[in-house]
Amino acid sequence: LLEEYREIFTDIPSETHLTEHKVVLTQKEPVRCKAYPIPYHLESVMSKELDDMLAMGIIERSDAAYASPIVLVKKSDNTYRMCINFKELNKITVFDPEPMMSPDDIFPKLSGSKFYSTFDFCKGYWAIPMEESSKDCTSFITPRGLMRFRVMPFGMVNAGSTYNRMVRKLLEGSQ
């Protein structure tokens, strides 16, 4: 089965049409932060990540007035994850109060079910496109110039709410 349906088991996220991520700001003045220094021995890690993200269509070049810094975070397997510090942008973002389901909400609904499934959404945030008017505020500083996200990045204050809403739409009627 895995071989027959290989195309659905991929490391490359595909975009959903269920929703887009919109960023609503409390001010018009763009957020501009200074770049954080990247240690020389990690520049190749960042460069490869940028190449991969450009090739997958996750990011694109930007000429926006916004600029957030990159942070390389060491993972438990000693590799690095490239993250964007959206802290200043998050401060001026209108909060989305989308309710998150808790285990106490979910487990009673599972009682008495005949079949159970799990989902592992490959890079799930990257499956959600950014609304066109919100792309510029995701811009971040690289040695190659500014880049911005075409899809929803991690680290934005309302990303979890948008993702939760998308999963809810995806699973509607499956109970």
Stretches found by the model and what they are:
Residues L1-Q175:
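Retroelement reverse transcriptase polymerase core
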